[in-house]
Amino acid sequence: MQRAVYPGSFDPITNGHLDVIFRATHLFAEVVVAVAPNEQKKPLFDVEERIALVEEATHENERIRVTQFDGLLVDFAMKENSVAVVRGLRAISDFEFEFQMALMNRKLEPSLETVFLTPREEFSYVSSRLIKEVARLGGDISELVPAGVSRALNEKLGESS
């Protein structure tokens, strides 16, 4: 069974992330969504909340598993018996960083491939950072995130007001 890892902070998960995840299930028997704590980014949601939001959005697909990971991605991927890391590319601006990461991962673990997927056009501009900013300012994000994320953002941002 070929397995891939899709890592990220998912703070919060967006429909762009989900597009990449669901399309990756057509390429791999299992996709492990690996949620990184990423405390240096000062996340809005803690890692347990982010895992719960990803699970809620993906629970109907038995080929998707959600878990937390810390440390080197290549170590985690090898522990999971993954053959590939899936990364989403929204724009050229993503490519340079992702390409450098793919090369470093290949240096650290030559057997681990990196597969780049682009989201559908309607999600090509969507990022977690933009979603949080639009939500903070009262904008409608309902078509850009799962319903559970929209509710969670409203609750979380309502708490901080």
Model-derived regions: residue spans:
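Nucleotidyltransferase catalytic core that binds NTPs
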Residues: 1-161
